Amino acid sequence: MTLCLCLTLLGCSALKLLYNQLPTVSYWWLDGYFDINDQQAPDLKLGLRDVLAWHKANELPAVNALLSDVEQQLEKPITGAQMCGWFTRFEPRVNAVLDRTAVMAALILVTLTADQLRYFDKAIAKNNAEWREEWLDARPEDLMESRLERAIENLERVYGPISRQQTEAVKARLAKDAYDFEQNWQNRLRNQTAFKGWLVAYRGRVLDTPEAKQAAAQSLQAVWRAAAEWRMTERQQTCQLLADFHSLMTPAQWAQAVKTYQGYQKDLQSLHLGG
């Protein structure tokens, strides 16, 4: 999942740098939610480094193979169904990371104190207030502008500069596929409630046997997998938007997309080999 975010948000030049910094970035992100104490910090830092080492050795080749398949199809017409097929192929890679991380995280999360759970509640409340202000309570025209801006930024990271005509086509697709912010909000609250329920249920448990550790990890994996599920309607809309844009791609944009994907593959191969 973290690698997917890297690919979406970064250019090739920054991918290797952030990937190798993921344990540090993840630690401080988690500290912002749980106020990690001195007893928990060493195990968490070591666990995050171990997850990254496992991902480099075991997951990067599969991710790179998928990127290679995508690159080879770029010069051909692509349907929304094909786009969704690539996303579906990536899901096992996301789940593998979630599952591996849960095995490590469960051992630390059970040590959270009551004060840390209250800290978590405050952090969630703050983030939810910001999310509501940006998305749920915003004017429709502002929502469309924000959605369009994000879509164009993500497309330009792969394809390079986008023309006014292409921007209007993306805007038309976004207008046709209305995003259900209320449903997204309810999903957000449900996932947060499920995770908080796990934290409360397992806080203070002694995981001193392989069976106890496995049960805690599997329970956490189920919570995280449910939270990571992508609603089918949103997935299909995103896939169709990408397919529509692909049909408008210029030769220069095609060349840039190929260059971008080849850069990703080169960086991931280097990371896999220890870079």
Q: For the regions a protein language model found, what residue spans apply to each?
A:
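Bacterial signal peptide processing site
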Residues: 13-16
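C-terminal motif of bacterial Sec signal peptides marking the signal peptidase cleavage site
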Residues: 8-11
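Extended amphipathic alpha-helical interaction segments
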Residues: 106-225
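Extended intrinsically disordered, low-complexity coil regions enriched in Ser, Thr, Gly, Ala
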Residues: 41-49, 57-68, 114-128, 175, ...
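Mid-chain, structured segments of secreted extracytoplasmic proteins
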Residues: 57-96
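A cross-kingdom marker for long, charged
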Residues: 27-28, 185-188, 192-275
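Short, structured motif recognition centered on aromatic/hydrophobic residues
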Residues: 30, 44, 101-112, 120, ...
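Start-of-domain marker
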Residues: 20-55
